[in-house]
C-alpha cells in the first residue's frame, strides 16, 4: 500500500528503485541502487544511492535529500 504525503509531513522525497547495481560496504551489507526521484525540485532525475536493508526494483524509498549521490562501485 503506497501512501503519498507532502514533503513537510514526512520529511523526505519519494524515489522509485529502477536498478540494483551491487553490494557495497565492508561485509556487503549495503546495496548500491539507482532510483528515480518522484517529487520535489529534482523530480524525474535518476540518482545513485547506497541503501541498507532489503530492496528490489519497484520499491519506493523516502530520501531526506536528493542532491547527494554515491560514488560508483569499483572492483579491485
UniProtKB/Swiss-Prot annotation:
Q: Which SUPFAM superfamilies match?
A: Nucleic acid-binding proteins
Q: Which residues form a coiled coil?
A: none
**Which BP terms in the Gene Ontology apply to this protein?**
maturation of SSU-rRNA; ribosomal small subunit assembly; translation
Q: Which GO terms describe its cellular component?
A: cytosolic small ribosomal subunit
| Keywords, comma-separated and alphabetical | Ribonucleoprotein, Ribosomal protein
**InterPro entries the UniProt entry points to:** NA-bd_OB-fold, Ribosomal_eS28
Annotated GO molecular function terms are: structural constituent of ribosome
**What's this protein's family per the entry?**
Belongs to the eukaryotic ribosomal protein eS28 family.
HAMAP family the UniProt entry points to: Ribosomal_eS28
- Full protein name: Small ribosomal subunit protein eS28
Q: Which organism is it from?
A: Methanosarcina acetivorans (strain ATCC 35395 / DSM 2834 / JCM 12185 / C2A)
Amino acid at each position: 500500500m503506497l501512501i503519498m504525503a507532502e514533503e513537510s509531513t514526512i520529511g523526505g522525497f519519494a524515489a522509485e528503485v529502477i536498478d540494483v547495481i551491487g553490494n557495497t560496504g565492508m561485509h556487503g551489507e549495503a546495496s548500491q541502487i539507482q532510483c528515480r526521484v518522484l517529487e520535489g525540485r529534482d523530480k524525474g532525475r535518476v540518482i545513485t544511492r547506497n541503501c541498507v536493508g532489503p530492496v528490489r526494483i519497484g520499491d519506493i524509498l523516502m530520501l531526506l535529500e536528493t542532491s547527494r549521490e554515491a560514488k560508483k562501485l569499483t572492483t579491485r
